[in-house]
Amino acid sequence: MVKTQIKEKKKDEKVTIPLPGKIKTVLAFLVVLAFAAYGFYIRHLTAGKYFSDPDTFYHFEIYKLVLKEGLPRYYPMADAPFGSLIGEPLGLYILPAIFYKIISIFGYNELEAFLLWPPFVGFLSVIGVYLLGRKVLNEWAGMWGAIILSVLTANFSRTFSGNARGDGPFMMLFTFSAVLMLYYLTEENKNKKIIWGTLFVLLAGISTAAWNGSPFGLMVLLGFASFQTIILFIFGKINELREFIKEYYPAYLGILAISYLLTIPGIGKIGGFVRFAFEVFLGLVFLAIVMLYGGKYLNYSDKKHRFAVVAVIVIAGFAGAYIYVGPKLFTLMGGAYQSTQVYETVQELAKTDWGDVKVYYGVEKPNGIVFFLGLVGAMIVTARYLYKLFKDGRRPHEELFAITFYVMSIYLLWTAARFLFLASYAIALMSGVFAGYVLETVEKMKESIPIKAALGGVIAIMLLLIPLTHGPLLAQSAKSMRTTEIETSGWEDALKWLRENTPEYSTATSWWDYGYWIESSLLGQRRASADGGHARDRDHILALFLARDGNISEVDFESWELNYFLVYLNDWAKFNAISYLGGAITRREYNGDESGRGAVTTLLPLPRYGEKYVNLYAKVIVDVSNSSVKVTVGDRECDPLMVTFTPSGKTIKGTGTCSDGNAFPYVLHLTPTIGVLAYYKVATANFIKLAFGVPASTIPGFSDKLFSNFEPVYESGNVIVYRFTPFGIYKIEENINGTWKQVYNLTPGKHELKLYISAFGRDIENATLYIYAINNEKIIEKIKIAEISHMDYLNEYPIAVNVTLPNATSYRFVLVQKGPIGVLLDAPKVNGEIRSPTNILREGESGEIELKVGVDKDYTADLYLRATFIYLVRKSGKDNEDYDAAFEPQMDVFFITKIGENIQLKEGENTVKVRAELPEGVISSYKDELQRKYGDKLIIRGIRVEPVFIAEKEYLMLEVSASAPHH
């Protein structure tokens, strides 16, 4: 009785932390706050005029839409002229919007708050790792894990100002939810347990709305539940298993419920994965039921039999899941590292190699020190877990969760470079565990306090070398990122020119990397045909145009309603990827085989210095003297296949070999200011013409034709803006005294002219050709000079006309033909339901379509449903994975059906409603036809069903100045 009273008394007594322990906790937390603030400072050093990360320009625009509209569904600037439904979870933007609403009280504007948001996420992440570390091991583990995270390059890479992607907020929220989960599972006070559990479920559920990669969090939590369930059962801890199931399973179900509910308004976007996770969870529930109640029928007498039961059920479950889901079962988060030709060329989606790990987890230099510290820490946690399991008989939640978190993070780290950041939390945590374990060991030593203090001090100083040496280097790097490529290369001026000198509904494109810059309200504020997250099927078509020459490179850009094409000279550095995606080179030539052999350099610029053209990085020197050209590559002398001189047009043929007998399959183009060494397969690429002004082509006259369709209108730094027209005139000849002579201007009076037309990627059909007489920018007369019933864009011919011209300052040649007009301003609706503008109807579906369209002037238009197929045809290699495979991009565009006619569109915004039906089989039959034609050589990249307005449209072909009459 006395013993019982004593026990009850002890039970009622509050456990207090000794004063030194409290001091250590307070001091550790203050240190963590200091380093979190230091980490925030470093991460905010990158804040400048623009964002360092191109994708963040897009995220900024959606963030502004959230502030304006609440829950926007549509982004009008992408995939011109159609726009795009927002595919990212709105939670990614709601979080910084809430942050802005709070700090705007202190005078911060939208942009300033957005620049502060990623460093703030980094600040909170440091605190989160501290709390998680102290829960997993001890105060030291949390503190040192936080210190390491504050200056870790891997974590900095996604939490610096100007990089506002979703993985940062997600990992921050997930880390805090993990802390709450561990407190929930280990708390004995019922009321506190309810509070911890509620917060855990809410925060874990909300975290899934921050990033489309948030299934990682659900899988970590599910993996932890699975391992704990199985291990407790195998070790015969049935009572503990019952308690764990009672506590954890309802919580996980609540997380799934919140995650799914957030997908309904678009705040989250992982509904499909939530359903999959629920199905897997049901499998785990079934396994748990068998464990708890199967003892009546199965042999649970020892660990071997219990393990056998689990093994059989798990194997059967995987087999069933594979039958149900298919091969995708083993591609967790596979969307982040899909194996397509485009993704092969995106650096962050490439497979992680050891060099990446050394850089992102290095201290002072690429050495991977933090990665190794984390590995040792993981071993310590594993050893502690096994000890507790076998010796103490406890159910160690903290260690098992940490191991699960670490293992799954490392797994993803090696799948794609983009996950180097994601793994930083687990690796920093385990690095802190290593430090915490060492310091805890010192504390428990039976030595005198001075000796322990000295040892602890030495260890602390050694650990402090990580932030003390790496922090300043990271800060220096951050400062250099403040000024972006936009400001130093000509992009800023070019895009501002575009915004200030083109109509509001104009569209523009470049290589896809720069699409978000074109769209940004900070820069171009114009619709882009392709960018880093939309219209990825078009990437191949852009590459085809840039990397190829002649008829095959003629793309129907008019179907995109393209107005301006921006060429960036520095894209020579990306030209291997462009050439590969455009079908000019093979996979081996692009990036080498598994041993790196066979890779080529497709383009190499050689700036001119005196009489030499030099690229010191590549050790290439070109000496030009009179009619001879000497090319030195390292210690070899090489003779290109051909040398061309611009503007003289002179050429010198060579052997294509080097002095050591190796092949040198390159063509050298020399201009007055720069030389270009080009791999023979891309030696006449359109990019070389447009970027460097080299009129090289395998097709006589093609360069002249190209420049009639692409007219340079602005240049700044390394960026050239071209105005695109699908129909141009590249040469005018006049019959002067019985002889046809090329003329460059016209005079008032009678003329007999021959017009050489370039139709780029699109036929001329039922068109009328006019000359507009212009006087002081005003049209004073329109003169009809010809009608063209049909002209194939692959087989143009000159048009002979007779015309009498009035007095004017210039004469404008204009082709009037039906073509696509207008841009969508809002998401289209079918029967009141929002639809993708590029997949507006399904086969056999009908309904009322509602469109909001903007036009730059009044039109009478017809409305069509149009199909666009973008696909690749393998033209070499045994299969699609062959290193010798090359893929020819194709784009087929055809009208399906007219769904509206004589629609009156007024300048500005218009709302149009029509009844429409997509005939059954029209898409599938064309797809089947392609598959029959190309077999296993076919890869379909995109199938679109688009609403397109067609109206009489004026195409400016050429404008020439007027001169005095001939004498």
UniProtKB/Swiss-Prot annotation:
It comes from Pyrococcus furiosus (strain ATCC 43587 / DSM 3638 / JCM 8422 / Vc1). The record marks 158 as: Important for catalytic activity. It is found in: Cell membrane. A motif (TIXE motif) lies at residues 345-348. GO terms for molecular function: metal ion binding; oligosaccharyl transferase activity. A motif (WWDYG motif) lies at residues 511-515. Residues 511-513 are annotated as: Interacts with target acceptor peptide in protein substrate. Residues 1-21, 134-135, 187-193, 237-247, 291-306, 382-396, 440-453 are cytoplasmic. Oligosaccharyl transferase (OST) that catalyzes the initial transfer of a defined glycan (ManNAcXyl(2)GlcAMan(2)GalNAc in P.furiosus) from the lipid carrier dolichol-monophosphate to an asparagine residue within an Asn-X-Ser/Thr consensus motif in nascent polypeptide chains, the first step in protein N-glycosylation. One of its GO terms (cellular component) is plasma membrane. Belongs to the STT3 family. It catalyses: an archaeal dolichyl phosphooligosaccharide + [protein]-L-asparagine = an archaeal dolichyl phosphate + a glycoprotein with the oligosaccharide chain attached by N-beta-D-glycosyl linkage to a protein L-asparagine. This is Dolichyl-phosphooligosaccharide-protein glycotransferase 1. It holds the Pfam family STT3. It is an enzyme of class 2 (transferase). The chain crosses the membrane at residues 22-42, 113-133, 136-156, 166-186, 194-214, 216-236, 248-268, 270-290, 307-327, 361-381, 397-417, 419-439, 454-474. A glycophospholipid binds at residues 418, 516. Its EC number is 2.4.99.21. A motif (DXD motif 1) lies at residues 53-55. The gene is aglB1. Residues 43-112, 157-165, 215, 269, 328-360, 418, 475-967 are extracellular. Gene3D superfamilies: 2.40.128.390, 2.60.40.3020, 2.60.40.3030, 3.40.50.12610. Its cofactor is Mn(2+); Mg(2+). The record marks 55, 348, 574 as: Interacts with target acceptor peptide in protein substrate. Keywords: Cell membrane, Glycosyltransferase, Magnesium, Manganese, Membrane, Metal-binding, Transferase, Transmembrane, Transmembrane helix. Despite low primary sequence conservation between eukaryotic catalytic subunits and bacterial and archaeal single subunit OSTs (ssOST), structural comparison revealed several common motifs at spatially equivalent positions, like the DXD motif 1 on the external loop 1 and the DXD motif 2 on the external loop 2 involved in binding of the metal ion cofactor and the carboxamide group of the acceptor asparagine, the conserved Glu residue of the TIXE/SVSE motif on the external loop 5 involved in catalysis, as well as the WWDYG and the DK/MI motifs in the globular domain that define the binding pocket for the +2 Ser/Thr of the acceptor sequon. A motif (DK motif) lies at residues 571-578.
